[in-house]
A protein has these predicted regions:
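Hydrophobic anchor at the beta1->P-loop junction of P-loop NTPases
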Residues: 25
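Walker A/P-loop
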Residues: 34
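P-loop (Walker A) phosphate-binding loop of NTP-binding proteins
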Residues: 28
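Conserved phosphate-donor/acceptor-positioning beta-strand/loop module used by diverse small-molecule
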Residues: 115-121, 133-155
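ATP-binding Walker
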Residues: 31
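ATP-dependent small-molecule kinase phosphotransfer cores
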Residues: 55-116, 120-122
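Small-molecule kinase domains that catalyze NTP-dependent phosphoryl transfer to phosphate-bearing small molecules
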Residues: 158-208
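N-terminal pre-Walker A segment at the start of P-loop NTPase domains
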Residues: 2-11
């Protein structure tokens, strides 16, 4: 390798080291992702910006457009795809029809200047990591014992204007497949955060993020 090539390689490594990070919060349904996400965004010391994903599913009680997700229609999804700005997408056949979740390069992501946090899945993590680079995209994987998780999901569903227990059961079973140990290993996720106790879990996640950023 010549001197110029070596200098360029070193320069690329330095630029990568000083680029921002995108932390992707993952876990099965009712594992506490939304609560953890909201808390981390409000820790000023971490300075995380929100990366809001898109979905075509209906809003749930208490959700706001632009906070949990950008709630859009099928036409918006197709527009992103046709313009080549679709980073990743997932489609789920639910009891209420087809629901899409996707990440789009909408001009609001600047890893040169900011660190971000988003909520996703193993599938979206792999595609976002491929798009932005392995060094820039880091997983935050939450775990909760299945019985506790189901209890939380039932309580949350009861608060909805029109509870949909059939969809709750579908999500619960789908999570067992989507977040199986084989897929977790394939995604190279080695650090997990137990969310049985919220305070302890938050302390562990904050400590990890600080170790990465500082």
């Amino acid at each position: 390798m010549g001197k110029d090539s070596k200098r360029q390689e070193i320069g690329q490594r330095i630029r990568k080291a000083f680029m921002g990070k995108l932390f992707l919060l993952m876990g099965k349904s009712a594992s506490g992702k939304d609560s953890i996400y909201d808390h981390l965004l409000n820790v000023s010391e971490l300075g995380l910006e929100k990366l809001v994903l898109y979905t075509t599913r209906p809003k749930r009680a208490g959700e706001l457009d632009g906070r949990e997700y950008h709630f859009v229609n099928e036409e918006t999804f197709l527009s992103f795809r046709e313009s080549g700005r679709l980073i990743e997408d997932r489609a789920y056949e639910t009891v209420q029809g087809l629901w899409r979740y996707f990440t789009a390069d909408d001009g609001k992501i600047d890893l040169q200047c900011h660190n971000y946090i988003a909520i996703g899945t193993l599938e979206s993590y792999e595609k976002i990591r491929e798009y932005f680079g392995k060094d820039q995209v880091l997983p935050l994987y939450l775990e909760v014992e299945d019985g506790e998780r189901l209890s939380r999901a039932l309580l949350r569903e009861k608060e909805q204007k029109n509870p949909n227990y059939e969809e709750l059961c579908r999500r619960f079973l789908a999570d067992c497949r989507d977040f199986c140990e084989e897929k977790i290993a394939e995604s190279e996720i080695t650090v997990r955060f137990q969310n049985q106790d919220r305070t302890t879990c938050l302390e562990a996640i904050e400590s990890y993020i600080r170790s990465v950023l500082y």
